[in-house]
Amino acid sequence: MEHRIATYLGGDAMLTALGSDTQESFRALAEGRCGLHPVGRPCPLEAAGSFAPGLLEALALEGLTPLESALVHCAERAVRESHLDPGGDECALVISTTKGNVSLLEGRTTPPDEAFLYTSACRVARRLGITRPPVVVSNACISGVTALIVARRMILDGECAHVIVAGGDLLSEFVAEGFRSFKSLSPGPCRPYDATPEHGLSLGEAVAAVVLTSDPARAKLPAVRLEGGAVTDDANHISGPSRTGDGLHYAIEGALREAALPRERLSFVNAHGTGTAYNDAMESRALEPVSYTHLTLPTTSRV
C-alpha cells in the first residue's frame, strides 16, 4: 500500500481587530462582536478593522517594519506551540501578503527595494533563524489560502517536514485609496450577499501564522489535517472577477477531488463575501450549481 504523507495543522497565532491571539479573536467572533469602527489612520475610513491602539508599537523590533515585527511575533508563538526548531534543515517559511510594506513608498524617502516583498520575507526569516530561502505568495485576496496550498505541496513533495506560514497586511493609504477609486468601499459595515444598493467592502488589518507539519506529534489537538486545495484563474481582469463563477467552481471541485471528499461531506463554507455586487453574484453562482442544491451549508465571509 502506498504511504501518503499527511499534513497537519500545528501551532497558530493571530492579531486581529477583535483580539491579540487566536482564542480572544474567536471568542469575540462567536459572541457576534464587530471589529469595524471609524479610523483616522492611515487615511479616514468610516468603517474599518484596525488593531488596538499601541499594539504595533508594543511589538516593534529593531530593524523591522511594523508588519514584519507582527509577522515575527505570530510566527514565534506558532513555533513555540509546535515545539519546533525553526533553524533546522526540515523547516521552511512561506510569507503571504498582498501589499506588504507598500506604505514605505509614501513620500519616496525609502529606497524602493526596501518595499520588495522578498526583501521583507528575508528579514523575517533571518529574525526567526530560518536558514532556507523564504517563499513569498502574493495573489490578491486568495494569498492566504494559496500560501497554505503551497506549503502543503512543499511537504508532500518532500522538500521539508514543517512549514511556517505567516501572513498579514496593515491598513495603508495606497490600498484604501485604490478601493475608493473603484467605488468599492462600503459607507458602513459591509453586508455580503445583501440586496441593498450600497455595496462595498470593509478594509481591515490582521496578521497570523500557522505551522503545517507532517509530524502528527506536533499537531494541535484535536488533530486537523489539510487534505486538499486548488488554485484556478478565471482570466478576467485585475479589477474584478469573471461573472460566470466558473473559476471558483473549478477550484472547489479541484479541492474536493484532491481530498477525495464527496460533496455530501461538506458542512461549512468560508466564502470571500466582499459585499460588492460582482464578487457576491459570482460566488453565489459558483456555489449554486446543480450538484450543491441539496446541501444546506452554514457560510461565513471574510474581507
Residue ranges and their predicted role:
Residues 2, 85-87, 117, 128-130, ...:
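Solvent-exposed alpha-helices and their adjacent loops that cap or buttress functional pockets
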Residues 4-16, 22-48, 189-259, 268:
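Condensing-enzyme catalytic core mediating Claisen C-C bond formation in acyl metabolism
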Residues 9, 92-94, 161-165, 190, ...:
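Short glycine-aspartate micro-motif
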Residues 9, 33-138, 169-173, 263-281, ...:
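Conserved beta-ketoacyl condensing-enzyme motif
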Residues 23-24, 106-116, 124, 154-157, ...:
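A glycine- and small-aliphatic-rich helix-loop capping segment at beta-alpha/alpha-beta transitions
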Residues 56-76, 109-114, 134-146, 194-208, ...:
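Active-site pocket-shaping loop/turn-to-helix segments
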Residues 75, 128, 135-167, 202-220, ...:
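Active-site-proximal alpha-helical scaffold in enzymes
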Residues 293-299:
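Conserved small/polar residues in nucleotide/adenosyl-binding loops
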